[in-house]
Amino acid sequence: MLSWLARVIKGIVIALGFILPGISGGVLAAILGIYERMIGFLAHPFKDFKENVLYFIPVAIGMLLGIGLFSYPIEYLLENYQVFVLWSFAGAIIGTVPSLLKESTRESDRDKIDLAWLWTTFIISGLGLYALNFVVGTLSASFLNFVLAGALLALGVLVPGLSPSNLLLILGLYAPMLTGFKTFDLLGTFFPIGIGAGATLIVFSKLMDYALNNYHSRVYHLIIGIVLSSTLLILIPNAGNAESIQYTGLSLVGYVIIAFFFALGIWLGIWMSQLEDKYK
């Protein structure tokens, strides 16, 4: 029973990766120790089918609960305390980086190619994500665009470190999606997002499973590069994105509070990583 409840809680935490800017559901799944099993199940669904279904049912329940429970308070906090919330998120991500670095060398030692891969990914993904607003603009909240949103959410699960909420903010789909989650809009929001997510999981899960099994170190160094760049970007104002972080009018006390929440976030990230080592 405790194991079942623990998996429900893991699902709730992973759901945060769908709705928090800068957070990746895949990273959270990796931190909580279920990422590789999830990828293996998606890539080979008929292998240990019953065992895996029973394992992931409470995770799925937790994800639905997490989306329903956190959409409204997160929307409120981002509207009223954006700077403090985003810095605490960034701290939590930074706190998990040591765990990802440790995981990256689980099967082989780190070499110069790994480091080059990490920093190249950091630079290219950072510049690409920052410029995305100026290239594609924003999208309306339509059925097809929510299918795209679902595909991005699924990629955020398949590719740890990729924050779909960051991309949805840039595309202008984040706020409409959050509103749909908050009101449990099944046909207008959940259904198209489910179509996009399901199709993406089916198409890309085998590719990710192959990459992890054959290029484990390279994949994780790519992940770390994206984690670092996406974390940096949520802390930098972007003139092309009206929903990006804003520091206007912040006092000295405000910066002290930022430092406190950043440190608190780092502690939370480290604690989550320790939970992975203990309970995965």
Where are these regions (language model features)?
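Multi-pass membrane proteins that catalyze or facilitate reactions on polyprenyl-/lipid-phosphate substrates
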Residues: M1-L20, S24-K280
